[in-house]
């Protein structure tokens, strides 16, 4: 009876649990639940593409799954064409696969986290930060490859008085570095906050429903409807955050290419 009264923390759902611990010398590696669900996301994506294209490029009349993949493909392709300027269509195609894979990975990870008893990979700051910094380093390399040392002019707006130049360069450099940080924090914070809120309200509604009194049962209907509404909202947030992450990548890449 006492065990049933112990309240679980809404943050327990974000705990990384080692499934297969491994020790290599002084280094500790482990296959965790986070690794498992990232692998499941990748497997689902590869299987989906395989079943759609196994007959040699898809059906002439697309089925529902093929239509979904084509819709996502065209959506990201149009996003790249609209947000990245100053390049020919063939050059833009070089960046398209990376942006498409990033969008689909985040989309599937976010939606997978909505399944009960699953794990939300993007709710961990280190994972989103590693993703944002790795992409941002790649964007910076593209900027140096295209402009060389002239890429540093990105840090100094035109027409700035010389006495203010050192301060503005420092501020622009900090602002530039914080782009990668904010990119990871935005995704992590939205996914973690939304899932925690759904967990808190669903736990409250379940506790009210488990009580025998009719007053508590009626009182649980309000939180229950709120949970259902928040679940729908969280689905929208999962899709929106993948879109926001992707469009910001395109904007930052456009800035690096065109020195905006």
Swiss-Prot record:
CDD domains: ATP-synt_Fo_a_6. GO terms for cellular component: mitochondrial inner membrane; proton-transporting ATP synthase complex. Its main location: mitochondrion. InterPro entries: ATP_synth_F0_asu, ATP_synth_F0_asu_AS, ATP_synth_F0_asu_bact/mt, F0_ATP_A_sf. F-type ATPases have 2 components, CF(1) - the catalytic core - and CF(0) - the membrane proton channel. CF(1) has five subunits: alpha(3), beta(3), gamma(1), delta(1), epsilon(1). CF(0) has three main subunits: a, b and c. Mitochondrial membrane ATP synthase (F(1)F(0) ATP synthase or Complex V) produces ATP from ADP in the presence of a proton gradient across the membrane which is generated by electron transport complexes of the respiratory chain. F-type ATPases consist of two structural domains, F(1) - containing the extramembraneous catalytic core and F(0) - containing the membrane proton channel, linked together by a central stalk and a peripheral stalk. During catalysis, ATP synthesis in the catalytic domain of F(1) is coupled via a rotary mechanism of the central stalk subunits to proton translocation. This is ATP synthase subunit a. The lineage of its organism: Eukaryota, Viridiplantae, Streptophyta, Embryophyta, Tracheophyta. The gene is ATP6.
